[in-house]
Amino acid sequence: MPKSYFITGIGTEVGKTVVSAIVAEALKADYWKPIQAGDLENSDSHKVKKLVSNKDSVFFKNACALNTPMSPHAAAEIDGIKLQIKNIKRPETEKDLVIEGAGGLMVPLNAKEVIADLISKEDLVILVSRHYLGSINHTLLSIEALKSRGIDKIGIIFSGDEHPTTEAAIKKLGKVKVVGRIEEEPYFDEMVVKEYAEKFRKRLCEI
């Protein structure tokens, strides 16, 4: 039965797009970013498509493409768009689906809804945690936010140079499966993504 993998992060610019490409490549899954705010000519969907080398993945259009690189609720207001989850329909596919969120879990979509509300309890969530001072707190808070919503199928991918004490603390206190860690690579291309895809495939299937 097809699965949905929701890729989120402990903040912005932590590596969600690269992770989305790796997961899509590993599982030959389809890809969808519901909301894109800004950079429409070089969107995350474009970036993922360039990084995925398998010929099976389908790349679905954004449900909502906003012009301003801001939090979705603010970007939607500038564009005069009423952004509501009830109007965001998941694409139909018979394959696994990778869904990339925008920013972190509590990024607002409107006055009542946040990114986390896009996640189904059946989704497998990949939380991307980049190492920096304060990342343990941000990671554990993100895990707590997911679990408080009844979302407990969570895997974590660390991003950046190895930090054993940080990773050990998150693993012990967060009680989530660690899929792996992405090194501070000089660049990402199809070959680098494919290497990580092969490395992470087994653990992705175990979440």
From Swiss-Prot:
Binding site for ATP: 13-18, 44, 100-103
Alphabetical list of Pfam families matching this protein: AAA_26 (PF13500)
Coiled-coil annotated spans: none
Keywords: ATP-binding, Biotin biosynthesis, Cytoplasm, Ligase, Magnesium, Metal-binding, Nucleotide-binding
One example of a Gene Ontology biological process annotation: biotin biosynthetic process
Record-linked CDD domains: DTBS
Positions that bind Mg(2+): 17, 44, 100
GO cellular-component term (any): cytosol
GO molecular function, a single term: ATP binding
Reaction(s) the record says it catalyses: (7R,8S)-7,8-diammoniononanoate + CO2 + ATP = (4R,5S)-dethiobiotin + ADP + phosphate + 3 H(+)
Protein's pathway: Cofactor biosynthesis; biotin biosynthesis; biotin from 7,8-diaminononanoate: step 1/2
Subunit and interaction comment: Homodimer.
Reported function: Catalyzes a mechanistically unusual reaction, the ATP-dependent insertion of CO2 between the N7 and N8 nitrogen atoms of 7,8-diaminopelargonic acid (DAPA, also called 7,8-diammoniononanoate) to form a ureido ring.
UniProt xrefs under NCBIfam families: bioD
Protein name from the UniProt record: ATP-dependent dethiobiotin synthetase BioD
UniProt source species: Christiangramia forsetii (strain DSM 17595 / CGMCC 1.15422 / KT0803)
Lineage of source species: Bacteria, Pseudomonadati, Bacteroidota, Flavobacteriia, Flavobacteriales
